[in-house]
């Protein structure tokens, strides 16, 4: 898989920040008591009531978004406008939705 859709680090950072902010907005609208989403420059974290943390962060040198949860890590490249896991070709939104759904015991669908 190629490095990503982005020609420069600045373009990657701009697009990645927009994706993270969009996800934060969706997560804020879900309004579950089981977790608290937080966005800081370059990363989005979800702190769950049981103490677990899900972290999605930008990795500028590789033009990837990295997700860590449940002792597992995923690396996403943007290909044709979609964030796809570089080893499994799964959608970032599908994986993140499944992780959150498992934690809150309800179906969550991020778009």
Please provide the spans of the model-predicted regions.
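N-terminal intrinsically disordered, cationic/polar leader segments
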Residues: 2-111
């Amino acid at each position: 898989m190629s490095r990503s859709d982005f020609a420069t680090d600045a373009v990657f950072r701009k697009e990645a920040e927009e994706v993270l902010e969009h996800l934060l907005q969706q997560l804020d609208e879900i309004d579950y008591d089981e977790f608290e989403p937080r966005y800081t420059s370059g990363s989005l974290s979800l702190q769950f009531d049981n103490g677990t943390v899900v972290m999605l962060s930008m990795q500028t040198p590789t033009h990837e978004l990295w997700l860590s949860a449940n002792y597992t890590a995923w690396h996403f490249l943007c290909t044709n406008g979609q964030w796809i896991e570089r080893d499994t070709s799964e959608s970032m939104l599908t994986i993140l939705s499944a992780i959150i759904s498992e934690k809150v015991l309800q179906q969550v669908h991020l778009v």
